[in-house]
Amino acid sequence: MVPEMRRRFLQVGTRRVHYLRAGEGPPAVLIHSSPANAFLLQPEIDYLARMYTVFAFDTPGFGLSQALPMQDVTVADLADALAETLEAIAMPRCPVFGSHTGAAIALELAVRHPARVSGVVLDGVPAFTEAESATLFADYFRQIPVTDLGSQYAAAWTRFRDQSIWFPWSSRLPENLNGYDLGPKESTHHWVSMYFIAADTYEPAYRAALLHYGPKALEAAAALEVPAIYTATDTDMLFPHMARLPPLKAGQEIRHIGTSYEAKRALIAAGFARFGGASAAPPDRDAIGYSDNLARQFVDVADGRQIHLRHAGRVGSDTVLLLHDAPGSALALEDLVCSLSKTAFVLAPDLPGCGASSRFLRQAPSIADYADDIADLLSRLGVADVAVHGIGFGASVAIELANRHPGRVRKLSLCGVLLPEPEERAWLASHYAPPIAIEADGSHWYRTWLMLRDSLVWWPWFDRRKAAQRLAPANFSAAHIHRWTLDVMGSRESYADLIYAALSHDARQALARLTVRPGLVLGGAVTPLSAYDARLAALLPDVRRVGVPAEGLLL
């Protein structure tokens, strides 16, 4: 059985650091390559978590970890940042594994902070000569601009597909062909996703490892005093670099593993066992609390799942709960969270299956399931009651939360409520949230981008007739729609769950059962479900109504 994995955030100085934690037993640290994040090490995490408490940190500027403040980053800077992270979590001396850029960071960490490291397993230490770096990477860091025409998706797909064909990917010569088969489409999709997440911040750290670290790597290897295992698969482009290492000290060795990734994982486990370290892993140190700025955390809920939560403001103030629209997540509410947090403690969870929150384990969850999950979240946070604002598909959850847990909801406001007629409901269920399957040519990225973009033009988005035009102002900026696309793509297998749940929910009856008098936000382009504003106003003729924004109904 694979041990359960948890996601966490940790405050390290002024930065938020995201990490994965899995397993029980002595602690061990894993460091990913670039331009990836800790999820790339999922197979290693699953393997090692049967024996260790594994901590896999997103390095600065990758995944969900904030970047270092300087533009000219060195591997030493990254190693020092990791040492600060280990200190912040009170990590005892333990074994460390790193791959490629992660191997460079692990090596530098062990040299600069040996008291923190019982030993290192280094998978592919980059030791390029300056001449090789100048030749191989002249065009390696080519920018892929985000455009309002969506051209970035074909460009990124081709770039990471090419990475599976040539090294470097930008030099398409016979002698640069990789000695293995083209990677599966799922692998290309994963790399494209990781790249886009880090696209604005990855380059300084990646350049530090590929362009400038080669000579320093050999110096660090010569200075290393802790036990070490150097390795790489035979097909790794960095395999030849092991021959460049200086003479090794006692307790340090080079190990060949052929082309077997299973052999690599077994070698890591054997190395960790030999290195030893502390017997007990540290507890997670960060919690929900006061924040002047927007902060994020993962909260454990039922069935081993987690809710990704954005929060801001001071605990003890009146609490406001924001429930987002779909498709998407609370990412769309960050500006509203910050605005409301000046006078309230604001919670904005990604609803289950959306954004970075775990999906329900059961098939076809209901709106009641979502409402109960949010009530459970509030209990776990120690929040007694909230002013709730539900937007679009999230409004259905807000209504059901007020009905099923009336003591929790002191105020309720709604912006766009799904109120289709029966035939319209079936029509929407058939077309509104199509599956997002990975395509070999990467076209699923553009198709998803186009779906979201079209939702700003037509209601519903797939009815592209003149009569269906929304005639509402919308944000068509390249950055906005691209961020939205990444958000939905991150939960592509479950993004539709909330939509189907709302389509199976009778909001008319639910509104009639309300014991708390809602306020309505009518008009504007906040949600496509504003198409039902006339029906909503007719159902609730005597309630307070405002235009956007909703602050007047909540505070």
What positions do the PLM features span?
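Conserved HGGG/HGGXW glycine-rich cap/lid loop of the alpha/beta-hydrolase fold
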Residues: Q11-A67, T85, P92, R305, ...
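Conserved serine/cysteine hydrolase catalytic core
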Residues: K185, H190-R244, H256, P473-R535
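Conserved catalytic-core motifs of eukaryotic protein kinase domains, centered on the activation segment
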Residues: L40-Q42, S65-Q71, A131-A134, H241, ...
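Catalytic active-site module of serine/aspartate enzymes centered on a nucleophile-bearing elbow/loop
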Residues: P246-Q297, P541-L555
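Flexible "cap/lid" loop of the alpha/beta hydrolase fold
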Residues: V111, G119-Y153, N403, R410-W445
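Active-site loop/oxyanion-hole signature of alpha/beta-hydrolase fold enzymes
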Residues: F55-T101, A348-F393, L555
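Hydrolases whose catalytic domains are alpha/beta-hydrolase-1, hotdog thioesterase
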Residues: I105-L109, V397-L401
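N-terminal cap/lid segment of alpha/beta-hydrolase-fold proteins
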Residues: M1-R16, A281-Q306
